[in-house]
């Protein structure tokens, strides 16, 4: 997992509440057994005017020019600004995969659905909570300033805007540690590889009957 320390990026404002996981990555794209290939179909039903299917050539599909992610000014955005209850709906880790693969490093919103919130941390995507007044201020600045960027400093737990305004945010200490060091569940386990090997070696000696062949 790629570490998240400090990120400066273009902001894209998605001004909709209750964005659910089926809108983030529609169900027909969940057939893949891989965790890659979802970025091109992020917000598929909003980005395109037709119904998308897995393996389809998106370059030939009609674009919804009214959807914010298709605006030229937000091309290459890596910070998604959202509204309340982002990531609600059914549980699918694919939603975090799609956002990450598209290029978003963080989603800023007043609140997140619990399962999406947890899945994001496990995949290196920072779900960053600011209060509604602060999010409203960011929306206002983003919509009037083309090329609006901001910086997220995870170590300092601050969002830093173009004019130097800073917004503090809270994050669980363990989750912060994992993001700063790029540690997913496997990475955390591998940190204890020597202890695991030592346990397995002595465990086999202490309880050999557990390893005897079945008869």
Swiss-Prot record:
Protein name from the UniProt record: 3-isopropylmalate dehydratase small subunit
Family: Belongs to the LeuD family. LeuD type 1 subfamily.
Enzyme Commission identifier(s): 4.2.1.33
InterPro entries: 3-IsopropMal_deHydase_ssu, Aconitase/3IPM_dehydase_swvl, AconitaseA/IPMdHydase_ssu_swvl, IPMI_Swivel, LeuD
Record key words, sorted: Amino-acid biosynthesis, Branched-chain amino acid biosynthesis, Leucine biosynthesis, Lyase
Xref: PANTHER family: 3-ISOPROPYLMALATE DEHYDRATASE SMALL SUBUNIT, 3-ISOPROPYLMALATE DEHYDRATASE SMALL SUBUNIT 2-RELATED-RELATED
A GO CC term assigned to this protein in UniProt: 3-isopropylmalate dehydratase complex
Enzymatic reactions: (2R,3S)-3-isopropylmalate = (2S)-2-isopropylmalate
Highest rank taxon of the organism: Bacteria
Top-level EC class as recorded in UniProt: lyase
Pfam families: Aconitase_C (PF00694)
Gene it is expressed from: leuD
Function of the molecule: Catalyzes the isomerization between 2-isopropylmalate and 3-isopropylmalate, via the formation of 2-isopropylmaleate.
Residue spans crossing the bilayer: none
């Amino acid at each position: 997992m790629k570490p998240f320390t400090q990120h400066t990026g273009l902001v894209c404002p998605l001004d909709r509440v209750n964005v659910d996981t089926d809108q983030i990555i529609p169900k027909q794209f969940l057939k893949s057994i891989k965790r890659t290939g979802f970025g091109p179909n992020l917000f598929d039903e909003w980005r395109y005017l037709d119904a998308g299917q897995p393996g389809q050539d998106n370059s030939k599909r009609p674009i919804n020019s009214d959807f914010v992610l298709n605006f030229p000014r937000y091309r290459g955005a890596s910070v998604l600004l959202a509204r309340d209850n982002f990531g609600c709906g059914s549980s699918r880790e694919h939603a975090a995969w799609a956002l990450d693969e598209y290029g978003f490093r963080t989603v800023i919103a007043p609140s997140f659905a619990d399962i999406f919130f947890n899945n994001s941390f496990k995949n290196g995507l920072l779900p960053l909570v600011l209060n509604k007044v602060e999010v409203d201020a960011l929306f206002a600045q983003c919509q009037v300033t083309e090329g609006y960027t901001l910086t997220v400093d995870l170590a300092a737990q601050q969002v830093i805007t173009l004019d130097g305004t800073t917004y503090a945010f809270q994050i669980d200490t363990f989750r912060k540690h994992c993001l700063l060091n790029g540690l997913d569940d496997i990475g955390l386990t591998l940190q204890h590889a020597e202890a695991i090997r030592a346990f397995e070696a002595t465990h086999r000696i202490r309880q050999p009957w557990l390893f005897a062949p079945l008869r």
